[in-house]
């Protein structure tokens, strides 16, 4: 089996489950040495064992990415053990999902102000810390890739105020880091997965109360055809092995766009759902859902329309 990332060194934060786990599995399958982080060593070891069975090497490291001292220690370990080499950093760690589920349908003034920290400390704050220390290894080498996991919640209202602000800041983090890193040969991008079948969401979607909420009921129907966690991993591998990656630096990269660009399918063989297709967009618009089934899948929402729709001017 081809190992296109053999010899490369990667760090994936928040990899004990969910998207981070899926990314770690695919990076190891591609032959890389992958450092995975999380807060519980036992779950990290389970992922590491699974990842190594696919190829590559996987090193579990307990690290709370909201704590700068722990982030610094992580990258010092990578520096020491890999002779200063770091090829790919994936800023994925996120601890806000349960808070989002617990505060659903509540306005920002109806929730504790501390919800900001619950959603963005292990997330935006940690992503910045990791980017700082990761770049210190990449810049001297004149190469590297930083991937920030974000979402369309950065463009339009989604879930709550701290979530949207945090995701918008993630996209800006990637764009501004890319600006400063470009002359050093280091790329930085923002990756938008679609709806993803994470363990936590699977558990939540199985609850009976979901059927009583019209919004969640609609979400559940889309969830059955959602992306697996490993599709994001396939996207990261494709980006990391793209010789023209600098041309994408600073951009927001939806997973469905990357699937089209690199000819990717999900790990179970399914085609990747294109959430930027006209039919997909219309299926979520009240009164226009009937029209979606009549539109061919190749018709997509032009990016300039998205830019106009989300313009703040």
Swiss-Prot record:
Q: Name one Pfam family in it.
A: adh_short
Q: GO terms for CC?
A: endoplasmic reticulum
> Which residues of the sequence carry a binding annotation for NAD(+)?
19, 64, 163, 167, 198
Localized where?
Answer: Endoplasmic reticulum
The PTM Omega-N-methylarginine maps to 21
Q: Where expressed (tissues)?
A: Detected in heart, liver, adrenal glands, and at low levels in skeletal muscle, kidney, pancreas and brain.
- Catalytic activity, reaction form: 17alpha-estradiol + NADP(+) = estrone + NADPH + H(+); testosterone + NADP(+) = androst-4-ene-3,17-dione + NADPH + H(+); prostaglandin E1 + NADPH + H(+) = prostaglandin F1 + NADP(+); isatin + NADPH + H(+) = 3-hydroxyindolin-2-one + NADP(+)
InterPro entries, A to Z: NAD(P)-bd_dom_sf (IPR036291), SDR_fam (IPR002347)
Q: Which residues carry this modification: N-acetylalanine?
A: 2
Q: Which GO terms describe its molecular function?
A: carbonyl reductase (NADPH) activity; estradiol 17-alpha-dehydrogenase [NAD(P)+] activity; oxidoreductase activity, acting on the CH-OH group of donors, NAD or NADP as acceptor; testosterone 17-beta-dehydrogenase (NADP+) activity
Q: Which CDD domains match?
A: DHRS1-like_SDR_c
Q: Enumerate the residues binding substrate.
A: 151
Q: What is its EC number?
A: 1.1.1.-
Q: Which UniProt keywords apply?
A: Acetylation, Endoplasmic reticulum, Methylation, NAD, Oxidoreductase
Q: Where is this region: Required for ER localization?
A: 235-313
Q: Where is the active site?
A: 163 (proton acceptor)
Q: Is Repressor set as a keyword in this record?
A: no
Summary of the function given for this chain in its UniProt record: NADPH-dependent oxidoreductase which catalyzes the reduction of steroids (estrone, androstene-3,17-dione and cortisone) as well as prostaglandin E1, isatin and xenobiotics in vitro. May have a role in steroid and/or xenobiotic metabolism.
The family assignment reads: Belongs to the short-chain dehydrogenases/reductases (SDR) family.
What's the name of the protein? Dehydrogenase/reductase SDR family member 1
Q: Which gene encodes it?
A: DHRS1
């Amino acid at each position: 089996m081809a190992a296109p990332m053999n010899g490369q060194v990667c760090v994936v934060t928040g990899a004990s489950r969910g998207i981070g786990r899926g990314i770690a599995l695919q990076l190891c399958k591609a032959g890389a040495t992958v450092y995975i982080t999380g807060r519980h060593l036992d779950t990290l070891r389970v992922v590491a064992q699974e990842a190594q069975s696919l190829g590559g090497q996987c090193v579990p490291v307990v690290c709370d990415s909201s704590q700068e001292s722990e982030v610094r220690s992580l990258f010092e370990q990578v520096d020491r053990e890999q002779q200063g080499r770091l090829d790919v950093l994936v800023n994925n760690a996120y601890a806000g999902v349960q808070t989002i589920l617990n505060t659903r349908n509540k306005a920002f003034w109806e929730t504790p102000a501390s919800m900001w920290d619950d959603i963005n400390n292990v997330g935006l704050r940690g992503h910045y810390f990791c980017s700082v220390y990761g770049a210190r290894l990449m810049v001297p080498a004149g190469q590297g890739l930083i991937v920030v996991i974000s979402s369309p919640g950065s463009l339009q209202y989604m879930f709550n105020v701290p979530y949207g602000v945090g995701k918008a800041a993630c996209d800006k983090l990637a764009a501004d880091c890319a600006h400063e890193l470009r002359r050093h040969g280091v790329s930085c991008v923002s990756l938008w997965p679609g709806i993803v079948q994470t363990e936590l969401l699977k558990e939540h979607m199985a609850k009976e109360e979901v059927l009583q909420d019209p919004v969640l009921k609609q979400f559940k129907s889309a969830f059955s055809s959602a992306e697996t966690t490993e599709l994001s991993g396939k996207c990261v591998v494709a980006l990391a092995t793209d010789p023209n990656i600098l041309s994408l630096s600073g951009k927001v990269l939806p997973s469905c766009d990357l699937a089209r660009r690199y000819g990717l399918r999900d790990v179970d063989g399914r085609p990747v759902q294109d959430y930027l297709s006209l039919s997909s967009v219309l299926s979520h618009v009240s009164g226009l859902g009937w029209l979606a089934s009549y539109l061919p899948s190749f018709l997509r929402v032009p990016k300039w329309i998205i830019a106009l729709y989300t313009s703040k001017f």
